[in-house]
Each structure stands twice: as C-alpha cells, then as structure tokens.
C-alpha cells in the first residue's frame, strides 16, 4: 500500500488504497499489510506501517508519521490523492486530512495512472523484499521494511529525480531554496 506524501515541495499528498495489488505478505502467522506514504516531489518514503489488519488504523498511523516528519506549514494547497479504498474514504481518515489542512482527492475508478507512483513503489517493494524469501511473522516483515525504507530513501538511485536517492533530492532542493533566500 503506497501513500505518497508531499508537503513542502510540490504541495501534493498522494495516497494509494489497499487492494489485492498492494503489498500484503503471506506470513506463517497470517497476512501482513504494508502502507507507505511517499513524497511525490523527491519520491521519499516519509511514512510507513506494517500491520496484521487492513483496518483504517494502520493507514492513519502511516499518515501521522508522514505529517510528523513533514510538519506542513501551509494551510491549503496540499492535496491528498487516493483511490477509493475504504480506508481512505472513511470518516476518520477524511477528518484527519481536513484537520491537517489537506484537501482529499479521490481518483477515478480503474485508472492506474492515478496511482502510478504508488504502484511503482509497491512493485519495487515486492520485488526487492517480499518475493525474496518466505516470511514467518509480522515482526520479520516490519524489520525488513524498516531496512528497505532506509536503503530506498538514502541509497536507491531514481532516474526521474536525476539518478540520485530521494534524500539527496530533498537536500539539493533545500540547499537551492537557501541560496535563493540569500540572494533575495
């Protein structure tokens, strides 16, 4: 499950809903679900959660982590895009977005382009982590996800952002903003 959060950059927050194509893992102890919140500008994963339940709570936890990490300063202009998954159209989720000053936006039915970045992250996660071995527990998936998110953010080179890692793309953005502020 990919959540794409952008708070300070292009002012766009995208979220992907839970569907059978989202990262879920068959572990020895049952299914495990994974949620990601991704900055759409730098493609940095800024929130994530692993859960044994597909209830809205774990999706809210991933969103809260992203909001805590990003601390959006602008009210208005930030859009949270999601598909029509039950978690994202729930009253609690929508209410939390509005409390944070984020405009909810729901994608059209069956339009894979609405969630292309989320699907890309899901595919990478499945190929690079989930399909590589059998999983015994949610805890094992959580530890592997933690390690992968750190690697993805700080070492994975992404062509759409100049063949640099997401954390470096952010650092360059802020350095450029600081240079502009000094010149002004």
What are these regions (language model features)?
Residues 21-184:
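Charged DNA-binding/catalytic regions of mobile-element recombinases
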């Amino acid at each position: 499950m990919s959540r794409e959060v952008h708070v300070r950059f292009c002012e766009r927050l995208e979220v992907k809903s839970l569907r059978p194509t989202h990262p879920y893992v068959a572990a020895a102890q049952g299914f495990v679900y994974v949620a990601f919140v991704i900055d759409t500008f730098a493609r940095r994963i800024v929130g994530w959660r692993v859960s044994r339940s597909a209830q809205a709570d774990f999706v809210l936890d991933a969103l809260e982590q992203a909001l805590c990490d990003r601390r959006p300063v602008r009210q208005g202009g930030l859009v949270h895009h999601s598909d029509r998954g039950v978690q994202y159209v729930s009253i609690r989720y929508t209410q939390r977005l509005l409390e944070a000053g984020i405009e909810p936006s729901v994608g059209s039915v069956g339009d894979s382009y609405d969630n292309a970045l989320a699907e890309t992250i899901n595919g990478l996660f499945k190929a690079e982590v989930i399909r590589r071995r059998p999983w015994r527990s949610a805890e094992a998936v959580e530890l592997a996800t933690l390690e992968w998110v750190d690697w993805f953010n700080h070492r994975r080179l992404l062509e759409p952002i100049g063949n640099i890692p997401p954390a470096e793309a952010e650092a360059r953005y802020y350095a450029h903003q600081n240079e502009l502020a000094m010149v002004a």
